[in-house]
Amino acid sequence: MEKLSSKDKELIRGSWDSLGKNKVPHGVILFSRLFELDPELLNLFHYTTNCGSTQDCLSSPEFLEHVTKVMLVIDAAVSHLDDLHSLEDFLLNLGRKHQAVGVKPQSFAMVGESLLYMLQCSLGQAYTASLRQAWLNMYSVVVASMSRGWAKNGEDKAD
């Protein structure tokens, strides 16, 4: 697992201080953007409230629980910036779960774009090129682990 620079960690922690306190509203921005980028992803969410539209999903308590979980994963990554390796097993398992429900590997890139969009919308002028790069660096480490779990789960199913 790659290590993040001290500057990356400082930028990520500083920006997450305010965002992490209001996870759901920021997560809603992230998922709204994700569904704009790929509306087909709505089909992966099967709750008592059908997610036929972005608005249906975003008003579903079950989906908002999923939003909270995603934001908690980001929170965990930020909390473990000094030792992202400690999250390896968790992230591998998360990748397996996403493969099992039909998430495609290219969707991870769209989630990354959506994360950056949320950061830009939420941070305004505090969103700088170096901050963007720091978050990209962290996200690439997280997604690399999830992708390994995704691929491993696919191999297990093929056997």
From Swiss-Prot:
A cellular-component GO term for this protein: mitochondrial matrix
Binding site for heme b: 66, 98
Globin domain segment(s): 3-151
Molecular function terms from GO: GDP-dissociation inhibitor activity; heme binding; metal ion binding; nitrite reductase activity; oxygen binding
Enzyme Commission number, as recorded: 1.7.-.-
Cysteines joined through disulfide linkages: none
UniProt keyword annotation of NAD present: no
Location in or out of the cell: Cytoplasm, Cytosol; Mitochondrion matrix
Pfam families attached to this UniProt entry: Globin
Keyword Membrane: no
InterPro entries assigned: Globin (IPR000971), Globin-like_OT (IPR050532), Globin-like_sf (IPR009050), Globin/Proto (IPR012292)
GO biological process assignments: cellular response to hypoxia
Catalytic reaction annotation: Fe(III)-heme b-[protein] + nitric oxide + H2O = Fe(II)-heme b-[protein] + nitrite + 2 H(+)
Keywords assigned: Cytoplasm, Heme, Iron, Metal-binding, Mitochondrion, Oxidoreductase
PROSITE patterns registered for this protein in UniProt: GLOBIN
EC supergroup of this enzyme: oxidoreductase
Subunit comment: Monomer. Homodimers and homotetramers. Mainly monomeric but also detected as part of homodimers and homotetramers.
Family assignment from sequence similarity: Belongs to the globin family.
Role played: Monomeric globin with a bis-histidyl six-coordinate heme-iron atom through which it can bind dioxygen, carbon monoxide and nitric oxide. Could help transport oxygen and increase its availability to the metabolically active neuronal tissues, though its low quantity in tissues as well as its high affinity for dioxygen, which may limit its oxygen-releasing ability, argue against it. The ferrous/deoxygenated form exhibits a nitrite reductase activity and it could produce nitric oxide which in turn inhibits cellular respiration in response to hypoxia.
Protein name, as recorded: Neuroglobin
Organism annotation: Tetraodon nigroviridis
Gene symbol of the encoding locus: ngb
